[in-house]
């Protein structure tokens, strides 16, 4: 039975919602009234483009205006991020946020902006596990054997990454610290050349997003030792979690959506609901699963909380590794 107090509280909440919606309608009679720019701060291709284009197409269909993907790569995502922060806070310029934003806050001491103050969280999109892959000729078949081999051969292992300061690089640094092993870090310009050299034996291993390596594992061209999330990946179900051996080890990549700070909360709320609805669509969910990713759900405040947690998590890893942008 609903009490009088509960009824009055619900009525007040409903009235406040109606008032906010009315104010939104007066100040923003038809958002969106023209095309919306969705900035991806990376070069075309890969999971970032697939996820962005999936969501932009669905938002275009649902909201009646075109959501256009604009790739603005450079400086580890900083160029695109800074461009969005400098844009008008009107909902017509959005940013595909990522792990790089959480890392750069502490990795780059000369960062020309404050991400936490410059971007309004809109919605989470997906989380992607990483996987430790090694050359097939390396005489190890598990995380425990890899650690034992590294300890028995200090400094002889080389581990690739997609670049200094990336989640792939820092996952390796965290692994080194937690496992008490040493190996040489070899940065590449992206995952593809690093994976190529792991397959050839030029380097012995690599932490990589499952999205770009699972097919090589399935084809038998690489050996997967463990995923970096606490749970196994649906796309590599036979690969255990690294945390099963190295208790407490956990990293991943994530993607979300942000807007310039001071974007009206009504617009943020609308976009959040539409993105969340899109992520619940069976077709989109399947496409995300096929990438090896996990859809993220929740309101804007929850995504903001996740960004805060991720930034703090990666700050600890950066401090532990001592790595800084030069």
Question: Language-model features: where?
Answer:
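An extracytoplasmic/periplasmic, membrane-proximal ligand-sensing/linker region
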Residues: 33-35, 177-178, 218, 265-326
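N-terminal secretory signal peptides and thylakoid transit peptides that target proteins
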Residues: 1-14
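Short loop/turn segments at beta->alpha junctions
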Residues: 3, 142, 187-190, 209, ...
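Hinge/capping helix and adjacent helix->loop/strand transition within the periplasmic-binding protein
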Residues: 86-91, 106-193, 242, 254-287
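C-terminal lobe and pocket-closing loops
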Residues: 127, 212-280, 312
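N-terminal (or domain-start) structured segment
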Residues: 25-116, 156, 181-204, 297, ...
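Beta->alpha turn/N-cap motifs
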Residues: 96-101, 161, 191, 207-213, ...
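N-terminal signal peptide c-region/cleavage motif recognized by signal peptidases
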Residues: 20-22
